[in-house]
UniProtKB/Swiss-Prot annotation:
It is found in: Cytoplasm. This is Ribosomal RNA small subunit methyltransferase G. S-adenosyl-L-methionine binds at residues 66, 71, 119-120, 135. The gene is rsmG. Specifically methylates the N7 position of guanine in position 527 of 16S rRNA.
Amino acid sequence: MELNGLRVSRETQERLQHFAALFQKWAKTINLVAPSTLDDLWNRHIADSSQVFQIHPKPVIWADLGSGGGFPGVITAIFLAELQDGWVHLVESNHKKAAFLRTALRETNARGSVHSSRIEDAHAEIGECGAISARALADLDGLLEYSAPWMLGEKDCRGFFHKGRDYLREIDKARGRWEFDLLEHSSAVEQESVILEISNLRRLV
């Protein structure tokens, strides 16, 4: 099996397939993603989320903010299971979604845990991390504010944020409040979309 042109092991493929089946089951009763995207679950959500680990395939500690239906946090945790190292802390305040995330992690033997708390309170629970991820959560300025407890003054902590066609406007807005190093990774799944890799975050105002 390949995702975004990269080979995926049989074990990881089986975990992803089991996650997809669980997701479809739970999505009948919980609004995990926009219903219009369920028919394209593999490409729109699983392959898209896989890009984060494919960009940064290292066994680090992740904080996945506003995890929702598990994208990209559960997908990253599934890839880490193959490495048998690293961990994903999934932060989701909605208790029904948090229950789904716990079930998904347990049944796929993924390397992660769920914190059903507000993002603003999560740093005290999680501690330091090597990477932050978020998808469909907030604009870049908001994401940097959420990520600041982990990233400010931590040169080795990187943020990986999915963004759509308006990402340049979001970058311009964020530069009014923050300084940061930026790498733009073009999406292999969505035309005009990117994953923004942020490091060396500094607050201006």
